[in-house]
Amino acid sequence: MLMRQKGIIIKAVDYGESDKIITILNEHGAKVPLMARRAKKVKTGLQAQTQLFVYGLFIYNKWRGMGTLNSVDVISQHYKLQMDLYVSSYASLAAETIERSMDEGDVAPYNYQLLQFVLEKIESGTSAQLMSVVVMLKCMKRFGFTASFNRCAVSGNDTQADLIGYSFKYDGAISRQEASKDVHAVILSNKTLYLLDVLQKLPIDKMNSLNIHQEIIDEMSDIILMLYREYAGMFFKSQKLINQLKRLEQ
């Protein structure tokens, strides 16, 4: 059966010497794995069309199991996401988070909207690292956990100015008054906790201007990755490149 669906490539894996297996998140919010024959050969024209983040109309044959890609009518190549290693690595983290949050057969229209929103924001100049934080905040529940950043997990104190870190012992933010009860709490700036709470609750269609200092973005990114590792046992493949880039900076 010949299928035509709009979608975005969220995963691309080399298969053999000349083929690729790509996964698209289609416009209905479903993951569709496709075999792209000879996609690594320049002459086929599929090499550029099967890169990560390509948004287009995918035409493929589907019977049982994995479909076979015929062609792609590219709507957006998202070149900016591929020209800078930092941008590409954090955009990959966002895509990987969404891809791994879904089991086979899941249909999640919101995930498609979220991915489109994030890629468009990055294209327009918003920090890719910040947008990866947004995705990870929005996908937490799909990995089986949540996190509270707006009140002390020990006392219930919801005075934002009193919050000074995140406690894995008590599973939530911790205030300065209770800090002695967890000497291993991760110390965070008050602004980081506040913005994590805002971004977690704010609908994506209300996120207009996102201008946040890099130090705050770094803190948010670090604690979010720690939360995923601690509560969901997740280590993302994209992190490997991110960690390598950070080491080169030191």
Swiss-Prot record:
Q: State any GO BP term from the record.
A: double-strand break repair
Q: Which SUPFAM superfamilies match?
A: ArfGap/RecO-like zinc finger, Nucleic acid-binding proteins
Signal peptide residue numbers? none
Keywords from the named record: DNA damage, DNA recombination, DNA repair
Q: Give the UniProt entry's GO cellular component terms.
A: bacterial nucleoid
Please explain the role this protein plays, according to its UniProt record: Involved in DNA repair and RecF pathway recombination.
Record family assignment:
Belongs to the RecO family.
Name of the featured protein: DNA repair protein RecO
What is the gene called? recO
